[in-house]
Amino acid sequence: AVKRFVFASSVYVYSREGSFYRCSKQAAESYIEEFQNVYNLDYTILRYGSLYGPRADSTNGLFRIVSNALETGVVRYNGSPDAFREYIHVEDAAKASVNALGDDFRNQSVVLTGQEPMRVVDLLKMLAEILGLPESVEFIEGDYVGHYNRTPYAYLPKLGRKYVAPFHVDLGQ
């Protein structure tokens, strides 16, 4: 029998950003929590930040930046030079994920990000130096759906407005 359901989510889950990816993670988390309420199946939700490391592919942001830099000789970033990220190596994320299987994390959501926020521009300059490329980094700024600058977290109260029809059939009719 399944004792606990473990779900890989995202720090974007309650962000203003993240587009349909955020929506899908948010819906999944709601289903998991409700399933626990109704059927008593324990869970742990792991909200990953910006991962990097071995076995990354073109779906990984840092992988795409490195691949493009190796192909073109220029480090480019689609986004703001003011952006911050908390990068976490996949091995650190894996160890943290295993630790999150402990009883302290039963029916909890756990944020797994790097040790501290890092300016994307600093990371990219470091990357350029490691690759032996000029330290000039090109930022392609624009309105990129799903990108945040400082934090993925947001306060997003959702209000519903009650409509009362001016004319209606009375309950006693």
Identify the role of each PLM range.
Residues 90, 121-122, 143-170:
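Conserved C-terminal active-site "lid" loop/helix of NAD(P)H-dependent oxidoreductases
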Residues 26, 51-64, 73-74, 78, ...:
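Glycine/proline-rich active-site loop of Rossmann-fold NAD(P)-dependent oxidoreductases
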Residues 24-32:
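Conserved catalytic Lys-bearing alpha helix of Rossmann-like short-chain dehydrogenase/reductases
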Residues 1-23:
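Conserved Rossmann-fold NAD(P)-dependent oxidoreductase catalytic core, especially the SDR/UDP-sugar
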Residues 97-101, 124-127, 173:
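Hydrophobic "lid"/C-terminal helical patch
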Residues 9-10, 31-54:
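Conserved beta-loop-beta element that borders a ligand/cofactor-binding pocket
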Residues 80-82, 107-110, 118, 124, ...:
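C-terminal "lid/loop" region of Rossmann-like NAD(P)-dependent oxidoreductases
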